[in-house]
């Protein structure tokens, strides 16, 4: 992986999230990708499961903002810090997240694995 590819993937991830587009989000992942939302949850497995997860996000979050900063890129992984804010619906609860991604991409630039650690303030 190189920095440019990782940056492009993160920008596309942010666009899919802020655009509330589960299809665009799922298209960023390999067919057999894993997505671990928190370190204590079992990872989602496969693009269909990731699509279902992002469908829920699209239904329950509005006014989404997303930013990121690349911290490191190796041949195997990219690490980024990210920030997001949104309004959870219902009940209209303002939410801020601050997190870290550990991401592995395949040769086509699709995510093979994503692990994240984040904190929430509401």
Language model regions located:
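Short, low-complexity N-terminal intrinsically disordered segments enriched in polar/charged residues
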Residues: 1-31
């Amino acid at each position: 992986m190189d920095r440019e590819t990782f940056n492009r993937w993160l920008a596309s991830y942010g666009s899919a999230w802020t655009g509330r587009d589960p299809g665009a989000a799922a298209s960023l992942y390999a067919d057999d990708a894993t997505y671990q939302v928190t370190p204590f949850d079992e990872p989602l497995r496969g693009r269909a499961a990731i699509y279902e997860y992002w469908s829920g996000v699209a239904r329950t979050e509005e006014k989404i903002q997303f930013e990121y900063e690349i911290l490191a890129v190796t041949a195997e992984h990219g690490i980024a810090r990210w920030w997001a804010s949104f309004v959870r619906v219902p009940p209209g609860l303002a939410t801020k997240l601050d997190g870290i991604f550990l991401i592995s991409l395949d040769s086509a630039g699709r995510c093979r694995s994503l692990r994240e650690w984040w904190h929430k303030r509401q």
